[in-house]
Amino acid sequence: MTKQTEYKRKPEWLKIKLNTNENYTGLKKMMRSKNLHTVCEEAKCPNIHECWAVRKTATFMILGAVCTRACRFCAVKTGLPTELDLQEPERVADSVVQMGLKHVVITAVARDDLKDGGAAVFAETVRAVRRKNPFTSIEVLPSDMGGVEENLKMLMDAKPDILNHNIETVRRLSDRVRARAKYDRSLEFLRRAKEMQPDIPTKSSIMVGLGETREDLIEAMDDLRANNVDILTLGQYLQPSKKHLPVLKYYPPAEFAELKEIALSKGFSHCEAGPLVRSSYHADEQVRSAKENTAEAK
């Protein structure tokens, strides 16, 4: 048995019960009727049934459903993106009202075809949601937008409640996992975001199971803390298709618990770690915890 086939069968802790109720079907119909996309669907998130059916939350994916990059872990379509939909910010804001969300996550495909990386539409979406939902906290999860400081500033000036940007993997594996994104550029993006808006919590996420070592993960944690990242999420990488990178290890829950303790000892204000944890998983609880810790620090 080869190393690649050794881990084909998912362990018991990754088997989930699909809970499809009227909340789930209702949200799906609403998204289609408003021509909106969610990363929950496009990235084949394993938590979609819990979030949609039980928690009634969703992560909106703006700027279209086609990404200009082809990261080897990601299920989102790659190709030539469609034209910008300038009405999308208002539709997202209306959907947040209709869903009654207390916390919303807004992410996007990478738009390297645009000079601003999609920052203008991203910022307008934040403002539109804020106008119509003044009591809803807003988390943004952008690409690095080409590493252009002006693009990041445009987004940060819209004053989201939390800035999330994922390094996805450890330094040693970064070029293989996401060739068109750079590890150090992502760290710089996170550092600049904190410098621009010191009171806005920053967050990043790492997938495990791609061949990283414990030492690699500790190095990544140290890199994030050195750039003042507040929140860390750690989750199991799951291969979307045979075309994507294989899973080399399934981490048991106990190992995630150990990694969480290490992360908290490094100074992260909050760490969500577990086999099915994704960047937006329990995002409302993460931002609340970060703000409480920030208030205590003051």
Curated annotation (Swiss-Prot):
Q: Provide the binding site for [4Fe-4S] cluster 2.
A: 67, 71, 74
Keyword S-adenosyl-L-methionine listed? The answer is yes
Q: Where in the cell is it found?
A: Cytoplasm
Pfam families, alphabetically? LIAS_N (PF16881), Radical_SAM (PF04055)
- The record lists its disulfide bonds as none
Q: Which UniProt keywords apply?
A: 4Fe-4S, Cytoplasm, Iron, Iron-sulfur, Metal-binding, S-adenosyl-L-methionine, Transferase
CDD domains according to UniProt = Radical_SAM
Q: Which reaction does it catalyse?
A: [[Fe-S] cluster scaffold protein carrying a second [4Fe-4S](2+) cluster] + N(6)-octanoyl-L-lysyl-[protein] + 2 oxidized [2Fe-2S]-[ferredoxin] + 2 S-adenosyl-L-methionine + 4 H(+) = [[Fe-S] cluster scaffold protein] + N(6)-[(R)-dihydrolipoyl]-L-lysyl-[protein] + 4 Fe(3+) + 2 hydrogen sulfide + 2 5'-deoxyadenosine + 2 L-methionine + 2 reduced [2Fe-2S]-[ferredoxin]
Q: Which domain of life is it from?
A: Bacteria
Q: How the cofactor binds, per note?
A: Binds 2 [4Fe-4S] clusters per subunit. One cluster is coordinated with 3 cysteines and an exchangeable S-adenosyl-L-methionine.
Q: Where is the Radical SAM core domain?
A: 53-269
A molecular function (GO) term: lipoate synthase activity
The EC number of this protein is 2.8.1.8
What GO cellular component term, any one, is given?
cytoplasm
Question: Which cofactors is this protein said to need?
Answer: [4Fe-4S] cluster
PANTHER family the UniProt entry points to? LIPOYL SYNTHASE, LIPOYL SYNTHASE, MITOCHONDRIAL
| Family statement | Belongs to the radical SAM superfamily. Lipoyl synthase family.
Q: What is this protein called?
A: Lipoyl synthase
Q: Which organism is it from?
A: Bacillus cereus (strain AH187)
